[in-house]
């Protein structure tokens, strides 16, 4: 009789232990970057956006992400933006909050007042009157000043600088000036704190070996690559090969600095989505489903955390960008179908792909 009574208790204890194991926090290797870019999060919080776990319980997003093994947060910085978002004030405040949760800070200098990418590298308005020599001084002093406020763990000097930065002076067509301006920014970082790791960031992987040849005399630590199948090709094998070639050629650790994948091609507001067509996907391996998104990031993780090949980690871009302004917003999220949370702001399975298991 006692055995019969004890059996349900034993089953309950086993079930509890299974749930406990499933919900255990993940601690990833500290010498890898397992990151998310949360640059839009302060704006979302300001507009009262909220998030839920897969049990429909409201969560503290920062604690939740940390518990899932994410150890680094990437933040973009604009020089003099039109509002407070991505400003030095906002980024300083947010980075201090992130440090309280134990995150490392990856600071992404755009050296512009707005988005910098291969198509647009506009000089900040404050530097519009500069000649080349004065621009060198401005970049050095600005970089040093920002670091005195934030003191990050990683500094990205420029964003997707395939064609240069701070145009026209730093255009790749004037490669010696471009290289000298990058070198000036890197020296500002080294002279402030030589423990900060410096990254140079290239969009894609095709042509990257030739691009980084320009910077063999520059003192930096990491090569960052953006990888989105829409723009950078649908062959993950080619990505893997080119990352290995970069490491072998230049001896730098390689990071996938930006990536993302859709869990659906539907929309949750009235704002045009950047990714919305099947032709932009890697099919049939990775459909726009929750499972397809998970499988894609698992493969990115496999490629980017193989430290034998000099690979150092990855960062998911826009994971927080739910349709936080409501489903009628014309100025809402262009990325809600690539977020880490579904259209009810509930955590998707992909969130568990950030944890590096013993088998990875």
Give names to the regions the model predicted.
Residues 47-49, 266-296, 303, 307-310, ...:
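Aromatic-rich peripheral "rim/lid" segments of glycoside hydrolase catalytic domains that contact
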Residues 34-38, 73-75, 105-109, 153-157, ...:
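Hydrophobic faces of well-ordered beta-strands that scaffold small-molecule active sites
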Residues 4-13:
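Sec-dependent N-terminal signal peptides
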Residues 59-62, 66, 191-197, 212-282, ...:
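Glycoside hydrolase catalytic-domain groove-lining segments
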Residues 48-66, 136-146, 206-216, 296-300:
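Short, acidic/polar
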Residues 87-92, 96, 117-220, 232-241, ...:
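Active-site cleft segment of glycoside hydrolase catalytic domains centered on the general acid/base Glu
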Residues 15-30:
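Bacterial Sec-dependent N-terminal signal peptides
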Residues 26-93, 97-99, 115-138, 224, ...:
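N-terminal substrate-binding region of glycoside hydrolase catalytic domains
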């Amino acid at each position: 009789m006692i055995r019969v009574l004890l059996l349900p208790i034993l089953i309950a204890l086993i079930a509890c232990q299974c749930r406990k194991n499933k919900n255990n926090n993940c601690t990833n290797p500290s010498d890898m970057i397992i990151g998310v870019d949360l640059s839009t999060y302060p704006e979302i919080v300001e507009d009262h956006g909220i998030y839920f776990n897969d049990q429909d319980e409201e969560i503290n997003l920062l604690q939740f992400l940390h518990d899932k093994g994410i150890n680094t947060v990437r933040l973009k910085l604009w020089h003099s933006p039109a509002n407070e978002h991505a400003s030095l004030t906002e980024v300083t405040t947010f980075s201090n909050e992130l440090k309280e949760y134990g995150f490392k800070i990856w600071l992404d200098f755009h050296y512009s007042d707005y988005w910098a990418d291969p198509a647009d590298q506009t000089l900040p308005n404050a530097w519009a009157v500069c000649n080349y020599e004065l621009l060198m001084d401005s970049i050095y002093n600005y970089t040093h000043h920002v670091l005195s406020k934030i003191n990050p763990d990683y500094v990205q000097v420029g964003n997707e600088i395939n064609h240069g930065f701070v145009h026209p002076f730093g255009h790749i067509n004037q490669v010696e000036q471009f290289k000298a301006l990058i070198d000036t920014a890197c020296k500002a970082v080294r002279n402030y704190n030589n423990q900060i790791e410096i990254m140079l960031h290239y969009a894609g992987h095709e042509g990257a070996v030739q691009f980084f040849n320009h910077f063999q005399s520059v003192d930096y630590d990491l090569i960052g690559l953006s990888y989105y199948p829409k723009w950078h090709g649908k062959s993950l094998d080619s990505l893997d090969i080119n990352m290995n070639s970069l490491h072998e050629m230049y001896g730098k650790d390689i990071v996938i600095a930006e990536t993302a994948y859709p869990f659906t091609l539907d929309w949750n507001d009235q704002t045009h989505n950047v990714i919305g067509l099947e032709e932009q996907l890697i099919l049939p391996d990775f459909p726009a489903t929750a499972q397809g998104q998970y499988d894609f990031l698992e493969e990115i993780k496999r490629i980017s955390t193989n430290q034998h090949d000099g690979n150092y980690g990855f960062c998911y871009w826009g994971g927080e960008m739910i349709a936080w302004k409501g489903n009628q917003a014309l100025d809402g999220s262009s990325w809600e179908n690539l977020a880490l949370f579904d259209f009810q702001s509930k955590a998707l399975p992909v969130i568990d792909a950030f944890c590096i298991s013993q088998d990875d």
